Amino acid sequence: MSNKVHLGHTARKRFGQNFLTDDSIISRIVGAISPDNDHVMVEIGPGLGAITEPVAMSIDKLSVVELDRDLVERLQNHPTLKDKLDIHQGDALQFDFSTLQQAGKKMKVFGNLPYNISTPLMFHLFEFAEIIETMHFMLQKEVVLRLSASPGCKAYGRLTVMAQYYCQVVPVLEVPPHSFTPAPKVDSAVVRLLPYANKPWPCKDVTVLRHLCTTAFNMRRKTLRNNLKQLISDEEFGLLNIDASLRPEQISVEQYVALANLLCDKQ
């Protein structure tokens, strides 16, 4: 049998499917997620149910979002899971997670995310941060390093700034390739994202912050002065005590928010 086949299902490359099969890793992830009935529990990409089953068995109801029709059908016919699941067949990148809201409950969102969509999916989920209590995701280790990076690190970038604007970022554990079928060609890691109830550095318009970060990091080897010359003058950098000769990865999330708020005030 091909190493791409697990439990009779062939992993689809276009969906970025790698199925978690290591029981000890699964147990640690479920422990980190801490499923309960006080939150709306939501899984993105349940796949063949490695994490789905232990989570669903410990709560009343689990909402799942799955794109692959074959996997949706398996879940709908699963002998023990079918009555526990609220199944949504569709693309998580387009899904309106606010439709899963319940009165008085925030969400706990988790998943073994397809690596080919993990970054755009993060940006999509940040839009729902106010209704989410925790997020736990299996990601490419490189993405976790980017999410948790500090200023001055090579991994620090647009994703870092936006993630840390919305959330506290906590790496949880590293997962080797042999924990999956088929084994991915990269190392993986689990990250915990805790959306802030009160953001430490509130931005007047997050759209402006996103645009600022995209522009600043577009050419990483150039200075802030060069990259942002159409937006911010040397005098304005000086007002905020930001050195315009620094590169984009050398200033903090707080400083990016200060620059964005300056731009908001100019509009």
From Swiss-Prot:
Residues bound to S-adenosyl-L-methionine: 18, 20, 45, 66, 91, 112
UniProt xrefs under HAMAP family: 16SrRNA_methyltr_A
Compartments, as annotated in UniProt: Cytoplasm
Recorded catalytic activity of this chain's protein: adenosine(1518)/adenosine(1519) in 16S rRNA + 4 S-adenosyl-L-methionine = N(6)-dimethyladenosine(1518)/N(6)-dimethyladenosine(1519) in 16S rRNA + 4 S-adenosyl-L-homocysteine + 4 H(+)
Gene field: rsmA
One term of GO molecular function: 16S rRNA (adenine(1518)-N(6)/adenine(1519)-N(6))-dimethyltransferase activity
Coiled-coil ranges per UniProt: none
EC number: 2.1.1.182
Keywords, ordered alphabetically: Cytoplasm, Methyltransferase, RNA-binding, rRNA processing, S-adenosyl-L-methionine, Transferase
Family statement drawn from the similarity comment of this UniProt entry: Belongs to the class I-like SAM-binding methyltransferase superfamily. rRNA adenine N(6)-methyltransferase family. RsmA subfamily.
One GO CC term on file: cytosol
Gene3D superfamilies on file: Ribosomal RNA adenine dimethylase-like, domain 2 (1.10.8.100), Vaccinia Virus protein VP39 (3.40.50.150)
Origin superkingdom: Bacteria
Protein name: Ribosomal RNA small subunit methyltransferase A
Predominant subcellular localization, coarse grouping: cytoplasm
UniProt cross-references to NCBIfam families, sorted A to Z: ksgA
Stated role: Specifically dimethylates two adjacent adenosines (A1518 and A1519) in the loop of a conserved hairpin near the 3'-end of 16S rRNA in the 30S particle. May play a critical role in biogenesis of 30S subunits.
PANTHER family xrefs: DIMETHYLADENOSINE TRANSFERASE, DIMETHYLADENOSINE TRANSFERASE-RELATED
InterPro entries, per database record: KsgA/Erm (IPR001737), rRNA_Ade_diMease-like_C (IPR023165), rRNA_Ade_Mease_Trfase_CS (IPR020596), rRNA_Ade_methylase_Trfase_N (IPR020598), rRNA_adenine_dimethylase (IPR011530), SAM-dependent_MTases_sf (IPR029063)
PROSITE patterns: RRNA_A_DIMETH (PS01131), SAM_RNA_A_N6_MT (PS51689)
